[in-house]
């Protein structure tokens, strides 16, 4: 595969895979996007992108957002090993904020880059189970 490939192994493809990541609390929110990250063991990093028509009516906009996500994921993939990353569009881009395609692309890229920087940070470990402490007056 080429240097810029986005192989199937690097994608979240099945409903169960998406659901397992969605079940977690969002790691970070930006003005327009939500980031979810889940540890996936020693497997390579995988990306899922959810861009609904409710928030991006035109296919051109949805495709531009997906391309930006895939490119930023590709650049940071070595830092994301062992994680499933899911990006979801959560709000519309008001027309007055993005008068041109270049402005739309710039805003998307800036927000997504910030989210991917958060995704590369170490994941917080789940709290370790502590053994129950004996109470005063109880016999072990």
Swiss-Prot record:
Domain of life: Bacteria
Gene name of the record: rnpA
EC number(s) recorded for this UniProt protein: 3.1.26.5
First-level EC class: hydrolase
Lineage: Bacteria, Pseudomonadati, Pseudomonadota, Betaproteobacteria, Burkholderiales
Chain's role: RNaseP catalyzes the removal of the 5'-leader sequence from pre-tRNA to produce the mature 5'-terminus. It can also cleave other RNA substrates such as 4.5S RNA. The protein component plays an auxiliary but essential role in vivo by binding to the 5'-leader sequence and broadening the substrate specificity of the ribozyme.
Keywords annotated in UniProt: Endonuclease, Hydrolase, Nuclease, RNA-binding, tRNA processing
Protein family: Belongs to the RnpA family.
Pfam families, alphabetized: Ribonuclease_P
Catalytic reaction annotation: Endonucleolytic cleavage of RNA, removing 5'-extranucleotides from tRNA precursor
NCBIfam families cross-referenced by the UniProt entry: rnpA (TIGR00188)
GO molecular function: 3'-tRNA processing endoribonuclease activity; ribonuclease P activity; tRNA binding
GO cellular component, one term: ribonuclease P complex
Identification of the protein by name: Ribonuclease P protein component
Quaternary data: Consists of a catalytic RNA component (M1 or rnpB) and a protein subunit.
């Amino acid at each position: 595969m080429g240097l810029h490939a986005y192989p199937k192994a690097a994608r979240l493809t099945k409903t169960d895979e998406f659901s397992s990541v969605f079940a977690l609390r969002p790691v970070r929110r930006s003005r327009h996007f939500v980031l979810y990250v889940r540890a996936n063991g020693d497997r390579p990093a995988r990306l899922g992108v959810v861009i609904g028509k409710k928030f991006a009516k035109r296919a051109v906009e949805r495709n531009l957002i997906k391309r930006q996500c895939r490119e930023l994921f590709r650049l940071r993939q070595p830092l994301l090993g062992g994680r499933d990353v899911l990006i979801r569009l959560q709000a519309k881009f008001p027309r007055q904020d993005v008068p041109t395609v270049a402005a739309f692309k710039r805003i998307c890229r800036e927000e997504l880059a910030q989210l991917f920087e958060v995704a590369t940070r170490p994941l917080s470990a789940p709290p370790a189970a502590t053994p129950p402490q004996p109470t005063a007056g109880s016999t072990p």
